[in-house]
Amino acid sequence: MSSLSDLINFNLSDSTEKIIAEYIWVGGSGIDIRSKARTLPGPVSDPAKLPKWNYDGSSTDQAPGKDSEVILYPQAIFKDPFRRGNNILVICDVYTPAGEPLPTNKRYNAAKIFSHPDVAAEVPWYGIEQEYTLLQKDINWPLGWPIGGYPGKQGPYYCGIGADKAYGRDIVDAHYKACLFAGINISGINGEVMPGQWEFQVGPSVGISAGDEIWAARYILERITEISGVVVSFDPKPIPGDWNGAGAHANFSTKSMRENGGYEVIKKAIEKLGLRHKEHIAAYGEGNERRLTGKHETADINVFSWGVANRGSSIRVGRDTEKDGKGYFEDRRPASNMDPYVVTSMIAETTILWKKS
């Protein structure tokens, strides 16, 4: 008799051409991820060839019970690292039956910005550093921390190794490999300053694909922690006190910034970001005021600043960029729970499209 693990790992391609497509979308809170699966007659590689679908929006805080149907529009396809074979993960955005985007559909406006000819011509690149915290199930306390107590002070945990410094590496490594299998442009991982906190990086990714890849990577991480009986938190300051928060630093460049003379373009872009600081902060994640205190490698939330190699500034420029006279900059303000569609498109809009009045 087959064991459960045998059935979970069963290769469908040996017996049928049919595949399983897991449709994934963002729920009513703007950070919760939902998904459900359907059978398709055969392999699909183009999201435009996937059928639209629907779900009960009243159960995700996205529609009233008397008119609960919400429509899923497939937008991006990734290989399914859990079912494998020809099975796929499908990133969707959400609409009313009349075709209007829901308020939680941040992809819709982002796609409009990225399709603007001036933005498309600049080929915007993003590298997102997604930090997160692993929590012990049921007690809302970081993995590896003594229950009701605290580990030793910060210092040995950043990029640390050893059973007394790195908690949850098996989850992190499984996630890394699963993202590579899925076709996500994940570029690295590392342990963070607070024990139980980790980071993965996605990019360089062009335009709207950065948001699609971050949401797909978050979904895969949620699934792996589900299997492991661990909870993943994207709270920007999960533990109060003298502990680092969790961010989602956004590294950004345009074609003009990557070419000779690009450093001057970067400085003009940073000036624009400073003029719209309040608007960006308002869109960069809930609870970010608990993280952006001017301590723990952050800038004060109320003060815009930038500097070369300064991790205490709002915007950091790397020394290589300064030396080469071209490159990229890092926006250190986004919280770990930010919507990547909002952050990436807003940076492009401000630096490329927005004009000072």
Swiss-Prot record:
Residue ranges annotated for the GS catalytic domain, each copy included: 106-357
Tree of life domain: Eukaryota
Cellular component, GO annotation: cytoplasm
A Pfam family this chain is assigned to: Gln-synt_N
Keyword Endoplasmic reticulum: no
Entry keywords, A to Z: ATP-binding, Cytoplasm, Ligase, Nitrogen fixation, Nucleotide-binding
Cellular localisation: Cytoplasm
Reaction equations catalysed: L-glutamate + NH4(+) + ATP = L-glutamine + ADP + phosphate + H(+)
Record-annotated GS beta-grasp domain positions: 19-99
UniProt-listed GO biological process terms: glutamine biosynthetic process
EC number(s) on file: 6.3.1.2
Xref: SMART domains: Gln-synt_C
Disulfide bonds: none
GO molecular function, one term: glutamine synthetase activity
Listed PANTHER family: GLUTAMINE SYNTHETASE (PTHR20852:SF110)
Family per similarity comment: Belongs to the glutamine synthetase family.
Other remarks on this protein: In pea there are distinct isozymes in leaves, roots and nodules.
Subunit structure, interactors included: Homooctamer.
Protein name per Swiss-Prot or TrEMBL: Glutamine synthetase root isozyme B
Organism: Pisum sativum (Garden pea)
